[in-house]
Swiss-Prot record:
EC number of this enzyme: 3.1.11.6
An individual GO BP term: DNA catabolic process
UniProt keyword annotation of Nuclease present: yes
Cross-referenced HAMAP family: Exonuc_7_S (MF_00337)
Domain of life of the source: Bacteria
Name the UniProt record assigns to this protein: Exodeoxyribonuclease 7 small subunit
InterPro entries listed in its UniProt record: Exonuc_VII_S, Exonuc_VII_ssu_sf
Amino acid sequence: MENKLSFEEAISQLEHLVSKLEQGDVPLEEAISYFKEGMELSKLCDEKLKNVQEQMAVILGEDGELEPFTAVGDEA
């Protein structure tokens, strides 16, 4: 799966695959292929969401409040 996809692109592709599978007229081999691709897209979306959660935790700090911004080199 191409990790260069944005979250929105991955979700869109996943929705498209789900729509195809829900129609019910997909041959078995093709359905399995769609399912595998969908699982990869789902994993990619999950990884991207976890990354955003980690970034938000850093921004908000442990107490849930915004942390003051410190520019690189301004730590002292």
